Amino acid sequence: MKLTKRNPILVLVNDFVIDSPLPTNLTYFWNFGSLLGVNLVILIISGLTLAMHYTPNTLLAFSSVEHIMRDVNNGWLLRYIHANGASFFFIWVYLHIGRNLYYGSYRSPRGLLWSIGVVIFILMMATAFIGYVLPWGQMSFWGATVITNLLSAIPWIGTDFVLFVWGGFSVDNATLNRFFSLHYLLPFILAALVVMHLLALHQDGSNNPEGISSSSDRLRFHPYFTSKDLVGFVWMAILLSIFVFFAPYYLGHPDNSIPANPLVTPHSIVPEWYFLPFYAILRAIPSKLGGVIAMFGALLILFPLALIHTNNVRSNRYRPLLNLLFWIFVFNFFVLLWVGAKPIAQPYILIGQISTIIYFLYFVILMILGCIMTYIYTKSNCFFIYFFLYFGCSIL
């Protein structure tokens, strides 16, 4: 008997990496999960090494980052890999989510798998935000001030909660220490959630481009899909190397190369590029509380997708209307990303408000179209059709 069949630990590795059965028609769009796993390992290793030389003190944080860049052997390489690796991590995540939205991978029986993935997405956004504060540059300080101030919109306890997060009356040394501790801890929680994500995937099985069950037409993960994943790893290494060695600051903000100064406000306060779509949604609502609700709602609306999607057909490739709707949603997401980087002025405010409406309207139309198509295919009634008809007539 093979060693991989006898050792309890190697049995798990064998079940997940070698003998795991996967549908034969998986495309390169199913590479993003493995890319994310490798990227997370790179981020954790580079982050742990950087933490050995970083000083979480407002007077020394910026200087310690410069010390890493100038004095630590290959410190510049570690920092560039960590910073640009975080950007690539979000690129793979957005592509991963987009593929799941297109092919309906959130549908039963993968509801738990999808929910764990959304939790990972929200937690990694929190991890990235507090990590962006650590260099203690100008944009780090003011970004932390603006974003943490959003918590004051919570009724009754908002102001006290902000002071609790700050550890004082402003973003200062206590805040930086708290953020450093959390940024050190959260990646390991992320890794634990990733393991849960893999367990759920192993339990429910992977989706495929057809969106139908393929239990009888499967191949082993190794060597058929490991070779496919290796191609993705090579491309990721090439793309990441281009940014690390030739354009390390391209995805960052130049103001963060200036030490934090509480007395000088930057001309425009913007977060990292991967937060911009949700930052645009936040700014689109004039009310502070309304903006916070809309921003978090844009993330939390991903949880009930399995309930919103009422069509019996899982994949969008066989539904022309939903296919068109999906690509409108993708284009609108890029519009939100573009608007989020622009100053708060017209016409960007109006464009952001329209794009925000389109963002949420996608999920409403997804539900209505699903009901209509289900009725056409099966002649069965849908509760949501009656609900929206009643709601629309009530408004009129």
Swiss-Prot record:
- Which is an annotated GO molecular function term of this record? metal ion binding
Q: Which residues bind heme b b566?
A: 96, 197
* Topology term for the membrane: Multi-pass membrane protein
UniProt keyword annotation of Cell division present: no
Where is the chain membrane-spanning? 32-52, 76-98, 113-133, 179-199, 225-245, 289-309, 321-341, 348-368
Any one cellular component term from GO for this entry?
A: mitochondrial inner membrane
* Residues that, per the record, bind a ubiquinone: 202
Location within or outside the cell:
Mitochondrion inner membrane
**Example of a GO biological process term:** mitochondrial electron transport, ubiquinol to cytochrome c
* This protein's UniProt keywords: Electron transport, Heme, Iron, Membrane, Metal-binding, Mitochondrion, Mitochondrion inner membrane, Respiratory chain, Transmembrane, Transmembrane helix, Transport, Ubiquinone
Identify the Gene3D superfamilies for this entry: Cytochrome Bc1 Complex, Chain C
Q: What InterPro entries does this protein's entry cite?
A: Cyt_b/b6_C (IPR005798), Cyt_b/b6_C_sf (IPR036150), Cyt_b/b6_N (IPR005797), Cytb/b6-like_sf (IPR027387), Cytochrome_b (IPR030689), Cytochrome_b_C_euk/bac (IPR048260), Cytochrome_b_N_euk/bac (IPR048259), Di-haem_cyt_TM (IPR016174)
Which function does this protein serve? Component of the ubiquinol-cytochrome c reductase complex (complex III or cytochrome b-c1 complex) that is part of the mitochondrial respiratory chain. The b-c1 complex mediates electron transfer from ubiquinol to cytochrome c. Contributes to the generation of a proton gradient across the mitochondrial membrane that is then used for ATP synthesis.
Q: Which family does it belong to?
A: Belongs to the cytochrome b family.
- Its name, as the record gives it, is Cytochrome b
What organism does this protein naturally occur in?
A: Spizellomyces punctatus
